[in-house]
Regions:
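Short acidic low-complexity segments
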Residues: 64-77
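N-terminal Rossmann-like dinucleotide-binding module
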Residues: 4-29
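Rossmann-fold NAD(P)-binding glycine/threonine-rich loop
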Residues: 93-163
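Rossmann-fold dinucleotide-binding core
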Residues: 16, 146, 150-216
Length: 440
């Protein structure tokens, strides 16, 4: 009987999706499932909902156990075959709010702030110390487990685990799975969805759709470029930044336009405020999204707990398919975030890259991609520089390394002076209190 440990099980909606998928999978439906969180109330909510799915969808075959608090973490992990990570250190309040409000005082605006930008840097710096604790426990009580990381900032957290721990780690993101489908649907090319072939590689949230053909092998990019240019010229829509990537760089990118607007110095510029409207960029999008999600979940939770009629159908989420492939040996292809062991020739070896991977009984096996077009590798490098420096800061615990990471972050460096970057970092660290007290 496999054991699956879910770290951050208070993330009820995501835990429901991943673990509900496992209950719908023959190789996993009788698993022992350990639910771990530091929030007792949210943990109990997840346990109630997952227990209902187990009864209604799985005939009660899975064994669910809860573990609350750091003092019970080792037991939650003991003997695990798979560890799913979905923690958020500092929650929406106070930490996400701080990550947006303090930079605003310096004139630095953000959209999502969970992957790059000063918000992404701060999120990594308060999360990596927690992952260090996880890693020590995993190395002792479940050393053969696969660590499936879903927490952002993906490249920084997964890269840290891959470089500095003995834990078998892969980072997983939805954006690879939805990239070409969203592109073709947005351009009215739904007739090309079936049988399409694609190659995606780069870094998390900035991986590139390098090739896309129809079922007969015909290149779809010429028509994509024509339609994307026409749509950007004709109307406001939610994907204008990525369509501009197609125009200027020649390729489409995995993650959404609201994300990519803040990964470079090109779109959110205090000197050119008209660009916000021109590219339909939703500033402060993540806080709005969090508020709506919290409200929506409260309503959904009340309905679920009232009638208990919750069931589940297996989704396209990677996690259960990865576990199934490793346990059964039946191969499955994913886009995974792994250490760049010669996979992308013109990105550094220390980088965490997102490439096609084949999963089977031997584990997660990344595929060699070769060289990216120069302009795409250069765009990736602007992000990788900040990622690597942030990991270094998390290792050294030195504030001067945090300053360096922020100075290398493209959007931050384009908007602020060095002195203001240092002041902003100090103010953020102080505002985060105990979450970042280790940085001296």
């Amino acid at each position: 009987m496999p054991k699956i440990t879910f770290m951050g099980a208070g993330s009820t909606v995501f835990a429901r999706n991943v673990l509900g998928d496992c209950m719908c999978t023959p190789a996993l439906c009788e698993s022992e499932i350990a639910l771990y969180d530091i929030d007792a109330e949210r943990l109990e909510e997840s346990h109630l909902i997952l227990s209902a799915i187990n009864r209604n969808t799985n005939g009660g075959r899975a064994v669910l156990k809860t573990y609350c608090g750091a003092e019970n973490r080792r037991e939650a992990l003991r003997g695990a075959d798979f560890v799913v990570n979905a923690i958020q250190v500092g929650f929406y309040e106070p930490c996400t709010v701080i990550d947006f409000e303090v930079p605003k005082k310096y004139g630095l605006r953000q959209t999502i702030a969970d992957t790059l930008g000063i918000g992404g840097i701060m999120r990594a710096l308060r999360t990596i110390p927690v992952l260090e604790d996880f890693a020590r426990d995993i190395e002792e009580v479940c050393p053969d487990a696969w660590f499936l990381n879903y927490t952002n900032p993906m490249a920084m957290l997964s890269g840290y685990m891959q470089r500095y721990t003995g834990v078998k780690t892969v980072g997983l993101c939805h954006s690879v799975q939805t990239c070409s489908r969203d592109l073709l649907t947005g351009l009215g090319m739904e007739d090309q969805l079936e049988g399409r072939r694609e190659l995606i590689a780069g870094i998390n949230h900035m991986a590139w759709l390098l090739k896309i053909t129809d079922k007969d092998g015909r290149d779809l990019y010429p028509e994509i470029k024509r339609r994307a240019a026409e749509k950007n010229a004709a109307e406001k829509h939610k994907d204008m930044v990525r369509y501009e990537y197609i125009r200027r760089l020649g390729y489409y990118c995995t993650e959404s336009s609201e994300h990519n607007a803040e990964y470079n110095p090109l779109f959110i510029k205090s000197k050119y405020p008209e660009l916000i409207e021109a590219y339909n960029i939703p500033l402060d999008e993540y806080p709005r999204r969090c508020v709506n999600q919290i409200k929506g979940w409260k309503e959904e939770k009340a309905n679920i707990l009232q009638d208990g009629k919750i069931e589940h159908t297996r989704s396209a989420e990677y996690a259960s398919y990865i576990m199934e492939a490793i346990l059964t040996g039946v191969p499955y292809k994913i886009g995974g975030n792994v250490l760049n062991t010669g996979l992308i020739d013109n990105l550094p070896a220390d980088a965490c890259v997102e490439v096609p991977c084949l999963v089977d009984h031997m584990g997660i096996n990344p595929c060699h991609v070769g060289r990216l077009p120069v302009q795409l590798a250069a765009m990736n490098m602007t992000n990788i520089n900040a990622q690597l420096m942030t990991i270094e800061a998390a290792r050294t615990r030195k504030r001067e390394d945090i300053y360096r990471a922020a100075m290398l972050e493209p959007h931050t460096a384009a908007e602020l002076s060095i002195d203001d970057i240092v002041k902003m970092c100090d103010e953020l660290i102080e505002a985060h209190g105990d979450y970042m007290a280790m940085y001296k």
